[in-house]
Amino acid sequence: PFFQGLFSWDHMPYDDEVYAQDDTPSLVNMTSKALDLLMAQGKDKGFFLMVEAGRIDHANHYSMATRALSETLAMDRAVEETVKRVVGEEPLIIVTADHSHTLSVGGYPGRTADITGVVRGDTGWVMKADDGQPMSILRSVLMSVRF
């Protein structure tokens, strides 16, 4: 069986925006529905399903670290749904990225620090970035990148 789920003329909304729009399915909802259709029509012969979470990249390009993490978690939920649904079916599940880089956390934050927070020194003072603004933990990773 072959089908496509096209829900937008352009990019899909970010995952945190989906829930404010009643007519737009989330990545996990689209994945679940695709699995329903594929398992009903092609279970005997197997099937191929590609799920893309391209908004992770978009959020990173615009330095929206919290949103990039939210998008990564949405993809994680889609993979989790897939694993749960195809258990015992001898699946081959491949998760990859087109840029194949990792997310690093810099600035030596404390062990329990919120990675979306600011970098603090030993006595609690807030570290400043080159532009004089408070340095966020994730922003410290991007300090050497010039946009």
What are these regions (language model features)?
Residues 1-147:
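A post-motif C-terminal structural segment
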